[in-house]
Structures are given as structure tokens and as C-alpha cells.
UniProtKB/Swiss-Prot annotation:
Full protein name: Transcription factor MYB24
GO biological process: gibberellic acid mediated signaling pathway; jasmonic acid mediated signaling pathway; response to jasmonic acid; stamen development; stamen filament development
Record-linked InterPro entries: EOBI/EOBII-like_plant (IPR044676), Homeodomain-like_sf (IPR009057), Myb_dom (IPR017930), SANT/Myb (IPR001005)
Chief location: nucleus
Disruption phenotype: No visible phenotype. Myb24 and myb57 double mutant has petals that grew to a final height parallel to the pistil. Myb21 and myb24 double mutant is partially sterile and has petals that just grew out of the sepals but ended at a lower level than the stigma. Myb21, myb24 and myb57 triple mutant has a strongly reduced fertility and an arrested growth of the petals that never grew out of the sepals. Myb24 and myb108 double mutant has a reduced fertility and a greatly reduced seed set.
Subunit structure: Interacts (via N-terminus) with TIFY10A/JAZ1, TIFY5A/JAZ8 AND TIFY3A/JAZ11.
Tissue: Expressed specifically in flowers. Expressed in all four whorls of the flower and in the vascular tissue of stamen filament and sepals. Detected in male and female gametophytes, especially in microspores and ovules. Weakly expressed in petals and the upper part of pistils.
Coiled-coil portions: none
DNA-binding segment(s): 42-66, 94-117
UniProt domain HTH myb-type: residue ranges: 14-66, 67-121
Key words, A-Z: Activator, DNA-binding, Nucleus, Repeat, Transcription, Transcription regulation
Length: 214
């Protein structure tokens, strides 16, 4: 359930801050605002865009979910190997590791490490080299015929859809409430670097798993 917090004092509605899952409407507002004005200072951006969210919440939502160059889909065996090698070298420096995996976020890599790789290494109980552990981990998952099919349990992702009816059904499943914009009535920029005339419609973007947190 959505929560609202007030910074107190003034009693103004502008002081209220929304907590909890982002709605489709908020996502569209944030994406279109950044497409037109750039990222800038996040606290100022949130207010200018008319979002009753903290600057931190807007930043995390954009960087981890809405940014056009965020890579979608399962982490590949090659990426798994890179994560293990760089973690052995740098430890839990997720932002630094993410720079070597284009399109992957530090949060996604951290979740993958903690829920997949680390769990497997602890379970194996072996003190082998990183290379050996990497090969064993990848081979173990490859032989199950679903190297990363189960990662969606721990990562919030979305994939495009061309079916508006399907998007509407998913909209209800993801607890967006009763907010279902008319097909094509809200347009989304394909990229912040491209012309303002290049847009995604809701049909092309949704469904999308919501980020439960700020």
C-alpha cells in the first residue's frame, strides 16, 4: 500500500513524499522529463517534474529500471565469469564492476552475486580457484538447461509487448491499480539522445515489474 510522509512544519501538500511502488504514470512523467531536460540535480528534478518522490528515489528508478541503455534479459555465462573474476579482484565494489558490464546496473550485479554465485560457492564448500569455481558454476547451471531462467525471482525486469490487452492485464497483476491509459494516448521517448519525435507508446513498453522501494 502506498504511503505518504510529510516533512512537517508547513502543512503544505508539496511537503508530502510518496513511498512504495512506482506507478506507470510516474514512470512516464520521469522518462519524458529527463528526455526533455536531462538528469540534472535529482532533488530539483523530482520537484520540477511534479513527482512527490525523493531525489534518491527518482535517481534509483531511472538508473536501475528506466534508463534506455539498461540491458534486459538473463546474465550470460560470459558475464558470470566476468563478475566472478572482478569480484575476486575488487570485492563488493559493485559500481566499479558494473562499468565492465555495459548495460548492467550495480544493483543487478550485486543481487546476482548474492543470490546465485555466492550461494553456490558456499554450498559447494570448496576452496578452489576463481577460475575453477567459475567453470563449475557455469557448467552446473548450463546442464540444467536454464542458465539463468530463475534470476527473474530476484531481479526486477520488464520486456516490451505489442499487445495492449496483455499490457492491461499485467497492469492489474503488478498492482498499478486502476490506472490504465488509453492505447497510444501517452507516448514515451525512445532515447534521451534522439529526436523528441521518436517515442514509445505504452503498448511497446509495458508490462514492467515495479520497483518496491525508494
Amino acid at each position: 500500500m502506498e504511503k505518504r510522509e510529510s516533512s512537517g512544519g508547513s502543512g503544505s501538500g508539496d511537503a508530502e513524499v510518496r513511498k512504495g511502488p512506482w506507478t506507470m504514470e510516474e514512470d512516464l512523467i520521469l522518462i519524458n522529463y529527463i528526455a526533455n531536460h536531462g538528469e540534472g540535480v535529482w532533488n530539483s528534478l523530482a520537484k520540477s517534474a511534479g513527482l512527490k518522490r525523493t531525489g534518491k528515489s527518482c535517481r534509483l528508478r531511472w538508473l536501475n529500471y528506466l534508463r534506455p541503455d539498461v540491458r534486459r534479459g538473463n546474465i550470460t555465462p560470459e558475464e558470470q565469469l566476468t563478475i566472478m573474476e572482478l569480484h575476486a579482484k575488487w570485492g563488493n565494489r559493485w559500481s566499479k564492476i558494473a562499468k565492465h558490464l555495459p548495460g548492467r546496473t550495480d544493483n543487478e550485479i550485486k543481487n546476482f552475486w548474492r543470490t546465485k554465485i555466492q550461494k553456490y560457492i558456499i554450498k559447494s564448500g570448496e576452496t578452489t580457484t576463481v577460475g575453477s569455481q567459475s567453470s563449475e558454476f557455469i557448467n552446473h547451471h548450463a546442464t540444467t538447461s536454464h542458465v539463468m531462467n530463475d534470476t527473474q525471482e530476484t531481479m526486477d525486469m520488464y520486456s516490451p509487448t505489442t499487445s495492449y490487452q496483455h499490457a492491461s492485464n499485467i497492469n492489474q497483476q503488478l498492482n498499478y491499480g486502476n490506472y490504465v491509459p488509453e492505447s497510444g494516448s501517452i507516448m514515451m521517448p525512445l532515447s534521451v539522445d534522439q529526436s523528441e519525435q521518436n517515442y514509445w507508446s505504452v503498448d511497446d513498453l509495458w508490462p514492467m515489474n515495479i520497483y518496491n522501494g525508494n
